[in-house]
Amino acid sequence: MEAEVTIMDNSERIEFVISEFRKADINIDEKQADKFVKLCDFMVEYNENVNLTSITEFSEVVVKHFVDSVLPFTMVDIPQGSSFIDVGTGAGFPAIPLLICRPDLKGTLCDSLNKRCVYLEKACELIGVKSEIIHARSEELGRKKRECFDFATARAVAAMPVLSEYCIPFVKVGGKFIALKSVNEDISAASGAIAKLGGEIETVRDYAIPNGDARRLAVIKKISQTPTKYPRNSGNISKKPL
């Protein structure tokens, strides 16, 4: 027998979003929840023509993309009005959900694929999220916008030494690189690479999203300027990690 599929109307979907965030001790209002509903619908529709995500079922999008993007930032002290860059943002995670919940932040989203950047522009306009979308390779942008942001973030599968070289150059001295990682990665193994880039490991914290999936948060503090030779070109970053 096939499982019965429950179809929710718009008000029920709004309530569902609010309840899933509440499970993570995050309070959002109906207006914010409605933005998440609209974002999900738009992303799933757009995904038919541009590869954005393999997760398209509403309840899974809410937990595995939306809550997953916001929850780790509740564990870090982020002052009002902070500027940040989401490096290799893809479909806009974690940046867009974070900006829905923290509209005081000044977000820049960087991606190397123009098709995704077009989607990001349209998605942000649709739900009324202010952001700067930049089509660029992150290692090239990291030389142009060097030490310009209060924090950088990435929700990526790349190993921590690779991710650190892409992200830490963007961060002001005294700022943070907030990495959203899987629990399988040993963050301490990247401490040497992080030090070469002007950072030090401040916090590593394991947690779970509402469905029980395990996650690891790594917070890197920028304690000195990144040497001008970093970031290297992408071939060296990935083939010869620090």
Where on the chain are the PLM-derived regions?
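Residue-level signal for inorganic ion chemistry
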Residues: 43, 98, 120, 181, ...
